[in-house]
A protein has these predicted regions:
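Short, surface-exposed ligand- or partner-binding patches at beta-edge/loop junctions that are enriched
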Residues: 12-14, 155-156
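Short hydrophobic beta-strand that contains or immediately precedes a catalytic carboxylate
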Residues: 100, 112-117, 133
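A short acidic-Thr-Gly-centered motif at the start of a beta-strand
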Residues: 101-109
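Single, functionally critical "micro-switch" positions that shape active/binding sites
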Residues: 16, 114, 158
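Rhodanese-like catalytic fold shared by cysteine-dependent sulfurtransferases
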Residues: 1-9, 18-94, 98, 123-151, ...
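Active-site proximal loops enriched in glycine and acidic residues that flank catalytic Cys/His/Asp
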Residues: 115, 156, 180
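Conserved alpha-helical interface elements of two-component signaling phosphotransfer modules
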Residues: 120
């Protein structure tokens, strides 16, 4: 963490943008200027013709300079990733649409689905039983409506903003997971891509 610059923008990517989004939140927590690359490598970077000219198989190295990180935040970030590594049920804090549907079909009362999309999109159709907590500035003021005795399944449009929120809630002690692919689209990924229905 101390090798990541504080004085310039850091762009973070993974395969889809979802685990990178968790990392972006943690970097923000540490005071770093981090931005998630939307769509990650698979659906973002690799599709850009100009990016292909910049790709290499050689690993980049960190510079020699180090940057101060608050000790408590450093510990929180280390504990976060230890928990990710120890997670047995849902890898990298992601739950698949199929896994969520199985929990719903089993009548699980131990989960709370949280839809982070806009009020308008939520009203137009949402996963059955989901509550609406639109993603955006000030949303943390409403975290107290979220149950602390249930597993939170967070869902947005693509899984990226839900991943950032997953990280924020886990740091605060919630058991939270991102719905992989988010709401998605028919014929694509996410809840709709898996062929599951919505309610109004």
């Amino acid at each position: 963490m101390e090798k990541i610059p504080n004085d310039r923008t850091v762009y973070v990517y993974c395969y889809s943008g979802q685990t990178a989004s968790q990392t972006v939140f943690l970097l923000h927590l540490a005071g770093k200027q981090a931005i998630n690359v939307s769509g990650g490598f698979d659906k973002g970077i690799s599709g850009e013709e100009a990016a292909k000219e910049l790709m290499t198989t050689e690993a980049a190295a960190f510079g020699e300079e180090t940057y101060t990180v608050d000790a408590d935040i450093q510990t929180a970030v280390e504990n976060y990733y230890k928990a990710v590594a120890a997670e047995k049920d849902y890898a990298k804090n992601n739950i698949s649409p199929k896994q969520l549907k199985e929990l719903m079909d089993a009548g699980s009362e131990d989960i709370c689905i949280v839809d982070l999309r806009s009020e308008e999109d939520y009203a137009a159709g949402h996963i059955e039983g989901a509550i609406n907590l639109p993603y955006g500035k000030g949303m943390e003021e409403n975290f107290d409506i979220l149950p602390t005795d249930k597993t939170l399944i967070l869902q947005c449009y693509s899984g990226q903003t839900a991943s950032q929120t997953t990280a924020a809630l886990r740091v605060k002690g919630y058991r939270a997971y991102n719905l992989s692919g988010g709401m998605g689209a028919e014929g694509g990924s996410g809840w709709l891509g898996a062929g599951y229905t919505l309610v109004k």
